[in-house]
Swiss-Prot record:
This is Poly(A)-specific ribonuclease PARN. The keyword Disulfide bond does not apply. CDD domains: R3H_PARN, RRM_PARN. It comes from Xenopus laevis. It is found in: Cytoplasm; Nucleus. Component of a complex at least composed of cpeb1, cpsf1, papd4/gld2, pabpc1/ePAB, parn and sympk. The lineage of its organism: Eukaryota, Metazoa, Chordata, Craniata, Vertebrata.
Amino acid sequence: MEITRSNFKDTLPKVYKAIEEADFLAIDGEFSGISDGPSVSTLTNGFDTPEERYTKLKKHSMEFLLFQFGLCTFNYDNTEAKYLMKSFNFYIFPKPFNRNSPDKKFVCQSSSIDFLANQGFDFNKVFRNGIPYLNQEEERVLRDQYEDRRSQSNGASTMSYISPNSSKTPVSIPDEQKGFIDKVVERVEDFLKNEQKSMNVEPCTGYQRKLIYQTLNWKYPRGIHVETVESEKKERYIVISKVDEEERKRMEQQKQAKEREELDDAVGFSRIIQAISSSGKLVVGHNMLLDVMHTIHQFFCQLPDELNEFKEVTNCVFPRVLDTKLMASTNPFKEIIYNTSLAELEKRLKEAPFKPPKVDSAEGFQSYNTASEQLHEAGYDAYITGLCFISMANYLGSFLSPPKDYVSCRSKIVRPFFNKLFLMRIMDIPYLNLEGPDLQPKRDNVLHVTFPKEWKTSDLYQLFSAFGNIQVSWIDDTSAFVSLSQPEQVQIAVNTSKYAESYRIQTYAEYIEKKNDESQTKRKWAEDGWKDLERKRLKTQYNSYIPQNPVFYGNCFAPSFAVKRSMSPIQEEAASDDTEEVHTHENDPSNPGATEQGKKPKNHKRQKIDSAPPETSDGGSSVLFEVPDTW
């Protein structure tokens, strides 16, 4: 079901009902771009830490717009032994609803726009008829502004009402505006003496309208109604009407209802995300870190600077998430799934040993045909993401005793995959752990190398030719990480570079230590800067100045989101629906399928790096995630 600004209000109850009835939800987003950096390595380096990757994405990706959001709800029918699916495809655009609402700015990446255009994406549905939105802080500010305007009744850009409680003091009018205001008052005097019911004041500036409101508010505390309207030519002018007390109250009620409706319309698509969050349902995505970051950034609050704070916010907004790309990249799937891109994964899961899930579209909802491959339509991508999850979850049922053909999303055997987001192209950290500390591989076989800008990948291979197979991961034009096959070779490589003039080699540990020292120095400088500022404030007796940190989830979250939920927020999910013993094959962990994509082409065959998550499933199940001894 396609949803734009035109039908959003009418379809909102259907969306709410679908979310409420669902067992789990699948989401996907389409963006105006991916990275504003000069190359892919700006966003992805094979030896990023989770903190570095988060910082890069926050810096280089959040200025793009999430302008299409796909939501598929899946509800299991026990009687028919099949899922019923409801698909929604939202077109989103931050159109300001009045002059006080945020006028957002975003950037586009030409390659992304060209790609979507070639896929048949209809940009008119975004830019002409996209659903608006506000985050929590923007909504709060606008509500406060409405309350202020209502209490002040000065209405520079909205309606105002002259009431018995109006100001009793004269208005101070600048000399250059007195002639204009005197003419308006003279016209109003004549208007009150004749039989006309309303009169228009010619278009004027916002400041002049404010003076008109204040003057009439003082001179005529009863009997007239003043409002600002906008013509078809976008000209704003004042209309003055004669009213009695009963009519004034009716107009006041109409005004308040209109304001509430306008604000609800402005909140727009954010109401969908709030409903998803409040439901506590499992949210499934594919390679979904960017989807989660953009969703929080656009519809809830600004992203925090620190990764741990981002995890807290994410757990608050989405108590349970599952990434199908990570699921397909780990035991027991990684030995039988070789390509984890969404389209290829969906095809692979139709073949043995997997079984295609039974999924029908609910009555009145669009059905998709996977043979037509409507990829990069967010609703379709969300749909096949849900199919992939169902197939892999049901496959886990074959390890139960006795085996089960259907595995619920609430099953204990699925829980080890919760709240872990796939990290692209990081060689030895396959996922971001939203529930605790991230994996910390030793990387004692990794070197940090700096060299002249003219060097290419072949120069690095030649430099390390004596050390066998290596892996190169570019950082920028003059530095890269080089991974050796044997950790004991690291010190030899460092020693050979002591007298080199054109390049420098240091261990990964030395590189991290130096980087941390620089960060601490910058932090200390910032703290000292605040101290100097405070001393200057006291010396010059300025007003108290309190530095404010960006608001993450305190003020910008509605009360229902302010408290971190339990990881099982739904009452009926407190107990698992499967208690059978779980048997899994113990396989040696292998590379989860991440491929390094550096700044320059590399023509060597990479070695596999052991990388598998350490968590285990609940309730006596065997280990699905394994950790190499070197971690």
